Each structure stands twice: as structure tokens, then as C-alpha cells.
């Protein structure tokens, strides 16, 4: 971030009136923990609760945050405000206690909006690519010495955290469309990476309602704000005529994009490309340490934002080239060994068919000669049901497949939308022979039967499969150079 030998003056944000102690219900979540960390570093007394300990709760405790395991009414006794995520039920004992004592209960996004209120907010929305794009923007602004505050849905590897209080007026944050809570935010710059049918229970199954919600989000921009939009995406193109704010576009395929990538080449995990920019600005030759067309688009959004903010071209290129990635976003662990084979282990958070397809494509680009074996954990029964045929099609494109059962995220089971059903449908398609994982403790032995020497093993999904990847890494990985 900023030069430690010459630190900037810390940007002063007015305090929230009458608020001293802030309690988070579900503090271990990626979005909640980041906001809690920023508020703690702003000087507030922060507490929180979660159902289990984790690396996140341990980190918060090390920051002197009071973290309780289990939800109990007395946890909120000292709270002046209680922050909840959309996953927290109204009958949660801490929520009930706060309501009885007339303590304000606010959604996570409303607290993020309060943090953003007095800052120069940059919000990144979209079905896919939010975390990586937010991280890239934060890294480039940091490389330029602008020392932003950031709140990200994954761990920024270079910072070792998913949130950080910066010394400047800049705030970069993800904008969550899953529950439409991004409508609370009032940024100065809004990025829309793409729009796809996901979390459709929030939108009553109506794609038009989903698209209009993105329009409403962009109209939260002030008249001097700007929307940065990917015109390679069909739904994004459809809503552009409805937007009454300044718009900057980017893309690869659309020749009318303001920022356009050309001459894209891959070299292992590196991607190089040329960026055409509007207004007579010189082209940029860019290098990323990440494979995949989707990451080129994420970088284009970053370049558009940074250029509009007046960031020096060299700082843009340095920030992109030096970007060390985000936890669980095509995270290369190293070499995983079984008694008979050695495979490269990659872990990725993607859990939508488009995201899984992008990971497979990126892996093919980076390692074109290797077999791809995927260990996949579906996430949510509703998503599996709504996108069932897309999952069957995409998961049939790997060379070996192990399927875990659905990570429910609190949803009730839906007949015909589980891991076994997916396994049957993929087998009937006839392109790959899937193996259903009956018991997660059997994963290592199943992998020993499936993996061949030189394979690429990808652990994929948004549930607890990240813990499986870490377990495999600890048990059988020789660290990468």
C-alpha cells in the first residue's frame, strides 16, 4: 500500500453518533468479518458471534474483538447496534434480544453503506468476478500510493486479509446482489461485471426484476458518478439504455467498448494482452499472473476505473503484474501426491456453471496437455435445481469427476437436485464417468484410484470444500516454488 516512510494523513470520517459497541451476528462470514475489521480499526468496540470457530474468528480475536461461539441473547447486552447478514433468521436469540431492547438491527450492507457514506466509494457488482475485480482495484490503487480502505469477499493474498482500513478517502468494496442489499450503497463509481440468473429466489424467478434492480443500483450513483460496465455481457448491454448516468464500457468481443483487450496470449499461469483506451490515451501492454479470459475482463474493469481516477499508467501495469491473487480464486497449492501419482492441486470458489466453465477453460489454457480431474461440491439446492442442465453440461467437460453432495447453506433438500441426481445425469450424458463421494473421509482414497501422474486436480465450490482443499494440501502437497 502507501509508502511507510512517508505515510499519508489519515482520512477522518465522522463518528456514528451514540454508537460505541457494534455486534455482528455471524461475524465469521467473509462479508461480515471485513466490515467488523474496518470498524475495529476505526476505533469502535466490536463483538460478534458465530456457530463455530475458524481462522477468521481467530484473526478477529487477535485484534481484540470479542467473539462468542454460539448465539445467545446475552451476547448483545452491551451492543448499541446489531449487524446481521441475510442468512440470519429473525428468530435468532440475539436478534430477538436486540429487538426487545430496541437496539437498532441493520443489514450488513447498510453498515457497509455507512462506512462508504463519507468516502469516495467504488462498488463492484455482478454475478461473477466481484471478488477478483475488487481486489485488483484495491491493489492498483495501493500501488499508486492511494492507500484505499477495502472490504472484499475473499482474502487478498498480498495483504493477508479480506479487509483493511486505509488512510485515504478511497473505499473499494463488493456490492452484493444476492439479496439485493447492494441497493443500500451510494458509491461514486459502480462496476457491473456481468448479470446472470442466480439467487433468483430473491427476484421471484423474474430476470426482468433482476435487471431492473441493477439499474436501480446504478441510479444510486450521484450525477457526477460513473458506471463501468462490461458490454460483452448480453444483459448488461440490455440495461445500458435505461441508465441516466455517465457510462464507461469495456470488453473483449465488442468492438465499440471504450476499453478493449486485444492480442491475448497465454504462457502457463501468465496472460498478456494489449489494452486500447479512449480519449487518445496510449495503449497499455498488460501482464497478469492469472490465466483465463474472465481475468482479462476483470483487469479491464480495473484499468477503466484506475484510468478514470487519474492513476499513472506505470502504477496500473505494476499493480496488475504484481497482483498475487485472492484466496480460493484459482489458488495453486502445489503438487498433491498419491501412492501412484503426482498432480497439481488448484482450489477455486466458483459455484455457478459460468464460473466453473471459466475455471476449466483457464486450466486448459494454462496446462493444455494435462488431464483435468475435478472434485466438485454443488452449492445450494435451489441453484442446483435452477441451473441443473447447465451444471450437467459444464461438469461433463472435465476428464475425471468426483461429485460431493450439495452444500445446503441452510436450504431444505429438493428432490432431484442433489449430488446423486447430478451424478446420474452426467453419467447418462456419456462424456465422463463421475464418482459420487458417499463420505468426505473417503476423498483421499477415491483420488488415489482416479488420479494419473501429471493430472491437474481442481477442488471446486463455495461450501466447505475449501477445507477439503486445505486438508489435501496439508496431507499431500509439496509446496510450489
Curated annotation (Swiss-Prot):
Residues bound to ATP: 126-132
Catalytic activity: UDP-N-acetyl-alpha-D-muramate + L-alanine + ATP = UDP-N-acetyl-alpha-D-muramoyl-L-alanine + ADP + phosphate + H(+)
Pathway: Cell wall biogenesis; peptidoglycan biosynthesis
Protein name: UDP-N-acetylmuramate--L-alanine ligase
EC number: 6.3.2.8
Matching InterPro entries: Mur-like_cat_sf (IPR036565), Mur_ligase_C (IPR004101), Mur_ligase_C_dom_sf (IPR036615), Mur_ligase_cen (IPR013221), Mur_ligase_N (IPR000713), MurCDEF_pg_biosynth (IPR050061), UDP-N-AcMur_Ala_ligase_MurC (IPR005758)
Keyword Transmembrane: no
GO CC list: cytoplasm
Molecular function in Gene Ontology: ATP binding; UDP-N-acetylmuramate-L-alanine ligase activity
Pfam family, one: Mur_ligase_M
PANTHER family: UDP-N-ACETYLMURAMATE--L-ALANINE LIGASE, UDP-N-ACETYLMURAMATE--L-ALANINE LIGASE-RELATED
Main location: cytoplasm
Free-text function comment from the UniProt entry: Cell wall formation.
Cited SUPFAM superfamilies: MurCD N-terminal domain, MurD-like peptide ligases, catalytic domain, MurD-like peptide ligases, peptide-binding domain
Keyword terms of this UniProt record: ATP-binding, Cell cycle, Cell division, Cell shape, Cell wall biogenesis/degradation, Cytoplasm, Ligase, Nucleotide-binding, Peptidoglycan synthesis
GO biological process: cell division; cell wall organization; peptidoglycan biosynthetic process; regulation of cell shape
